[in-house]
């Protein structure tokens, strides 16, 4: 697997992530179970975005010093494009978490605890998936066509799908987990497991955590191939992906109260997936430059938010009238 990642770059990335996770876990441990306020969520979202951009700037500077601008510029642009793709697609994941927490009546104070461990699990699972994907592409380059066709199909499916929380309990996976886990009927504070009559029982909070992890894996199956459309370098794919999901918890609490205001977002994300799928399918006939891909993704997001704002304005006006 060809990569610009040197031991220094890999080590620096690992140190930054470890320090930030340690700070996050330390704050979680000191404060105990509590809901993140909108102000805190906005502050942490800004911290994660700023840290991601600073890392990309340091990455670019390092490559300028070691490889030159001809290498540094496209690689830094690839990181930024991958980060934007993952960040935008992650919003749909946040909406699924909202449905899960609502269906299982998880108190806001406990949602943060679930998401702390959910993000930690996502880091491990996505790292495995990215290195596996990089290896497969290095061995079988035709697999990019499969990724492209899958993203094209997923984009169309996303635009046509209708999801609501009412059917979550009837999903085969949820029924299977409930049937095979020794589980209590109610949430017991912040515990994932409790002991009753000498036996260990999982609580519904553990079921929610499992579903959060599985939902992230499902979304990663979409988002990781999407970044492979930009670059197959495992260092850039992994770092851009993980920096994007590290801010997911703060994004969740930032959007939790206004999710219904983003009714058009799934259509914008669907268009992005279709564009990336087409980009992968035509790669042997025409290579779309990274800068163009970044511009298209950014443009789609801007247009989506403009249309969404107009739709909200019309709805608010109708309700007010």
From Swiss-Prot:
Role noted for this protein: Has been proposed to be a redox modulator.
Name of the featured protein: Putative membrane-bound redox modulator Alx
Primary localization class, coarse: membrane
Pfam families for this protein: TerC
UniProt-listed GO biological process terms: cellular response to pH
Transmembrane intervals: 7-27, 44-64, 90-110, 114-134, 136-156, 199-219, 226-246, 262-282, 287-307
Membrane topology: Multi-pass membrane protein
Organism lineage: Bacteria, Pseudomonadati, Pseudomonadota, Gammaproteobacteria, Enterobacterales
Family: Belongs to the TerC family.
Organism: Escherichia coli (strain K12)
Expression induction: By extreme alkaline conditions.
Side Periplasmic, residues: 1-6, 65-89, 135, 220-225, 283-286
GO cellular component terms given for this protein: plasma membrane
Membrane topology (Cytoplasmic): 28-43, 111-113, 157-198, 247-261, 308-321
């Amino acid at each position: 697997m060809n990569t610009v990642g040197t031991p220094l770059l890999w080590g620096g990335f690992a140190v930054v992530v470890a320090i930030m996770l340690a700070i996050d876990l330390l704050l979680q441990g000191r404060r105990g179970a509590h809901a993140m306020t909108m102000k805190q969520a906005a502050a942490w979202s800004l911290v994660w975005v700023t840290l991601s951009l600073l890392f990309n700037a340091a990455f670019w500077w390092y490559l300028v010093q070691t490889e030159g601008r001809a290498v540094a510029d496209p690689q830094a642009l690839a990181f930024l494009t991958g980060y934007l793709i993952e960040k935008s697609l992650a919003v749909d994941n946040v909406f699924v978490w909202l449905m899960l927490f609502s269906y299982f009546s998880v108190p806001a104070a406990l949602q943060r605890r679930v998401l702390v461990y959910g993000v930690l699990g996502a880091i491990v699972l996505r790292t495995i998936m990215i290195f596996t994907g990089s290896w497969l592409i290095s061995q079988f380059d035709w697999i990019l066509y499969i990724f492209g066709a899958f993203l094209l199909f997923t984009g169309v499916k996303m635009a046509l799908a209708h999801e609501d929380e009412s059917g979550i309990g009837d999903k085969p996976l949820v029924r299977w987990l409930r049937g095979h886990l020794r589980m209590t009927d109610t949430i017991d504070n912040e515990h994932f497991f409790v002991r009753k009559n000498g036996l260990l029982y999982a609580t519904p909070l553990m079921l929610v955590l499992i579903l959060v992890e599985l939902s992230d894996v499902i979304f990663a199956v979409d988002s990781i191939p999407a970044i492979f459309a930009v670059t197959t370098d495992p260092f850039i794919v992994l770092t851009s992906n993980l920096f994007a999901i590290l801010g997911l918890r703060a994004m969740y609490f930032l959007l939790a109260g206004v999710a219904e205001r983003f009714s058009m977002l799934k259509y914008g994300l669907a268009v992005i997936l279709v564009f990336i799928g087409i980009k992968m399918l035509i790669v042997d006939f025409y290579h779309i430059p990274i800068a163009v891909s970044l511009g298209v993704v950014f443009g789609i997001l801007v247009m989506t938010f403009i249309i969404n704002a107009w739709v909200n304005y019309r709805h608010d006006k109708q309700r007010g009238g």
